[in-house]
Amino acid sequence: MNVGIFSRWNATCGVSLHAEMIGRELLRRGYPITVFAPYLESASRWWHHKLIRPDEEYVVRCYEELSPDGKEGKIDIEKVLEREIDFLIVESYEKLPYKDVEKLVKILKDKGIPSIAIIHEGDYEDIRYTDMNIFEKVCVFDERYVKEVLKDRVSEEKVEIIPYPCYPVREGSREFAEDGVIKFFSFGRQPKEEYCPYIEGLKVFKRDFPNVKYRIVRAMEPLKIFEDFVEQEERILDYEEIVKELHSADFHLLPKGNTKRVVVSSTLYQVLGTLTLTVVPDNRFFETLPHGEEAPVIFYRDVLELVKELKKASADEEYRKKIRENASKFVEENSVERITDRFENLINSILVKNVH
C-alpha cells in the first residue's frame, strides 16, 4: 500500500509536523509514502512556514498555496496522477488551493483511490470546500472541531476524532537546578508580545530565587529585552537540538497568545516527552489537556499566578515529580505509535470497504 500525503513538509508549523509524525511512522512500518508538498517559493511566502531540512526522495513539490494577497493557489494535478498511490491523506489547512484539492480528490475517487482529510482549520469560515463528503472520512483532533469548525459541513458518520500525536518519552538526566541556577528555555517563532508574561514573571520570581537564566532561541530577530538573566540566540533548531536544549533546562516556557479559534499547540506535542517541566497559559491552545491533579503541564492565567506556580514548582520536589508523571502518562496515551495505529486501522478499513 502506497500512501500519498498532501501537506506542508519539512517546515516549522503544526501541519507539517503532524504529516511528518504520521508519515515517517508509516514509512518505519514498511509502507511506501509519497508526499505532495507546496512549491518552495509558495511555501516561503508565509512567515511561519520555514524549511528546516532538505526534502527526501519521496517528496514531490507540486502545488501553490493561497497567496498572502488572497490569490487562489493551484495544483499541478498531473504530477500527482503520475505517482502510484493507493490512498491519499489530505492535511487540510486554510492556505490550501481548495478548488484543486476537490478536483484531485474526485479524480482519485473515480479511479478507486479513496481520500481522508485531517482538519487543521480553526474556524468554520476557513474551510472552503464545496462538498466535504467527497472524503471517505474527515478527521479532527478533538470534539471542539466537530462543534465549532465542521458543524454541518459533513455528515456525522464521516467524522473521526483522532488526537494530535506526541513524540515518545525521552527523559534527560539533569537534576533540578543542579548547577545552582534555575534554567528556563523557550524556542520558536512566536510574536514578541507572547514572551512578556514570562519576562515580567521572572523579574518577580528572581526576588526569591535570584540565580535564574532564561534562554530564548528564536528563528527570527531577537526580542528587545535587556535583562541580565536573559540570553538570546537567532537560530532554527531541529528536533534533536530542541531535545538537547530542553534536557539542559529546568522549565520550558511555552509562549502562546489566546485566540477565539479552535487550536492545538503542536510545539507541546512535539516536546512534552522530554519531561522538562512545561509552563503554558491556560487558553484555547491547551484547554483540552487534563487540568488539576492530572495536569501534564503547569498552567497560569496571569503573571501573579505564573510567579506563584513557578515558586511552588521550584520549592516542591513532589509537585515536580507529579507533573512529570502526568506528562509521561499523557505522552504514552497519545504516542505517535498509538495515533498511527488509529490511522493505519482507518485506512485499512476504508480500503477493505472499497474492495467490497
UniProtKB/Swiss-Prot annotation:
Keywords in alphabetical order: Glycosyltransferase, Magnesium, Transferase
Record GO terms (molecular function): glycosyltransferase activity
The prosthetic group or cofactor this protein requires is: Mg(2+)
Enzyme nomenclature, EC number: 2.4.1.361
> What is the reaction catalyzed?
bis(myo-inositol) 1,3'-phosphate + GDP-alpha-D-mannose = 2-O-(beta-D-mannosyl)-bis(myo-inositol) 1,3'-phosphate + GDP + H(+); 2-O-(beta-D-mannosyl)-bis(myo-inositol) 1,3'-phosphate + GDP-alpha-D-mannose = 2-O-(beta-D-mannosyl-(1->2)-beta-D-mannosyl)-bis(myo-inositol) 1,3'-phosphate + GDP + H(+); bis(myo-inositol) 1,3'-phosphate + 2 GDP-alpha-D-mannose = 2-O-(beta-D-mannosyl-(1->2)-beta-D-mannosyl)-bis(myo-inositol) 1,3'-phosphate + 2 GDP + 2 H(+)
Question: Where does the record locate the signal sequence feature?
Answer: none
Its biological purpose = Catalyzes the transfer of the mannosyl group from GDP-mannose to di-myo-inositol-1,3'-phosphate (DIP), producing mannosyl-di-myo-inositol phosphate (MDIP). Can also use MDIP as an acceptor of a second mannose residue, yielding di-mannosyl-di-myo-inositol phosphate (MMDIP).
Of which family is this protein a member?
Belongs to the MDIP synthase family.
Q: What is this protein called?
A: GDP-mannose:di-myo-inositol-1,3'-phosphate beta-1,2-mannosyltransferase
- Lineage of producing organism: Bacteria, Pseudomonadati, Aquificota, Aquificia, Aquificales
